[in-house]
């Protein structure tokens, strides 16, 4: 199928969650999840046509809900349709929707599973409180054994600090996976560059070292050197797209956009951020794993899954995702850079 040509940060309207985590960014933004319903403006067959490779190129589409992504079976059907359209998929989920994970295993072909990554967020203390740790770890292991690329992600919240060794050992013993870490963001004010921790940043970064997490190391680099003053191809080679409404924006913090599902006979009107980033720091490391700022030495996708994590991904995913989109674009279109 070839390498990806675009990264899509995809939103879906799964506006409910079965967990209640203290550091949840939606909770910090006072976004209530209890009574909300899951609503989708377009049906899946229409979305599949709207997301054709002819319009978008081959994409890596990361799906995430405002709540638990897989709480709605619709997301599994959407992911399969996007795979049928020729794309690669990631689904960020909390690993507890056992029936919908089973439905995914039963409805995806082997080839589709090989083009699907499952990012399992691990909410240790909340899962322990609800007595669902075993269910979570069993689901992760089962999906890995079924041919999916799997990834355990732990947001390094202060409440986990006393349990870090236990968490790491549990993931290795029960799921055969060394987890990755991410910085916990203070989302109560998205205009500021702040981590949600009472620790000094020096000690906070030190706590992550035993995990040898390339993802955390990239997050740290982006925190210390926000890179928002550099020329960025978000809005063109990477976008934020709400699959429930069809509305596309440049990225999480840059709001230029439009509905790209209204007139699917027309080209997608991409508009890159360029020098005009409005974010306090680039807190979505995936944008830089796929290289939306040219000329940087940030890690590749294969670096994230190197060493003891190598067995968690397929060669198909490595071949497709091991690229720097902006560097490739600049080489192919030298006349269009920094327009």
What do these predicted regions represent?
Residues 50-55, 79-84, 104-115, 137-145, ...:
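Acidic (Asp/Glu)-rich catalytic clusters
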Residues 190-323, 327-330, 334, 338:
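Accessory C-terminal segments flanking Radical SAM cores
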Residues 46-66, 311-328:
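Short Fe-S-cluster ligation motifs
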Residues 123-244:
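Radical SAM enzyme [4Fe-4S]-AdoMet core and its adjacent flexible, acidic
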Residues 38-50, 76-77, 101-104, 130-140, ...:
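Well-ordered, non-membrane alpha-helical segments in soluble/globular domains
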Residues 36-46, 295-302:
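Short cysteine/histidine-rich metal-coordination sites, predominantly Zn2+-binding motifs
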Residues 7-8, 28-41, 57-72, 83-100, ...:
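Core AdoMet radical
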């Amino acid at each position: 199928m070839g390498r990806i040509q675009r990264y899509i940060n995809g939103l879906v309207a799964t506006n409910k969650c079965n967990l209640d985590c203290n550091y949840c960014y939606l909770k910090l933004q006072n976004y209530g999840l209890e009574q909300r319903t899951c609503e989708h403006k377009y049906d899946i067959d229409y979305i599949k046509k709207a997301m054709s490779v002819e319009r978008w190129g081959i994409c890596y589409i990361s799906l995430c809900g405002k709540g638990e992504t897989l709480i709605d079976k619709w997301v599994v059907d959407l992911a399969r349709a996007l795979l049928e359209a020729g794309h690669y998929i990631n689904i960020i989920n909390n690993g507890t929707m056992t029936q919908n994970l089973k439905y995914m295993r039963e409805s995806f072909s082997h080839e589709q599973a090989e083009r699907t990554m499952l990012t399992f967020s691990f909410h240790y203390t909340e899962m322990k409180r609800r007595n669902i740790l075993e269910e979570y770890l069993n689901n992760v292991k089962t999906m890995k054994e079924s041919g999916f690329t799997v990834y355990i992600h732990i947001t390094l919240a202060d409440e986990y600090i006393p349990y870090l060794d236990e968490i790491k050992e549990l993931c290795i013993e029960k799921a055969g996976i060394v987890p990755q870490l991410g910085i916990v963001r203070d989302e109560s004010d998205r205009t500021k560059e702040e981590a949600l921790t009472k620790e000094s940043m020096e000690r906070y970064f030190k706590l992550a070292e035993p995990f040898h997490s390339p993802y955390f190391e990239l997050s740290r680099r982006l925190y210390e050197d926000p890179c928002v003053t550099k020329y960025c191809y978000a809005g063109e080679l990477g976008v934020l797209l709400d699959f429930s409404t069809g509305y596309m924006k440049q990225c999480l913090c840059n709001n230029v956009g439009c509905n790209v599902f209204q007139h699917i006979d027309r080209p997608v009107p991409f508009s890159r951020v360029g020098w005009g980033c409005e974010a306090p720091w680039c807190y979505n490391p995936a944008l830089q794993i796929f290289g939306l700022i040219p000329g940087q030495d940030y890690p590749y996708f294969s670096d994230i899954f190197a060493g003891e994590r190598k067995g968690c991904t397929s060669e198909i995913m490595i071949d497709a995702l091991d690229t720097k989109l902006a560097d490739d674009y600049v080489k192919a279109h030298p006349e269009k850079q920094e327009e």
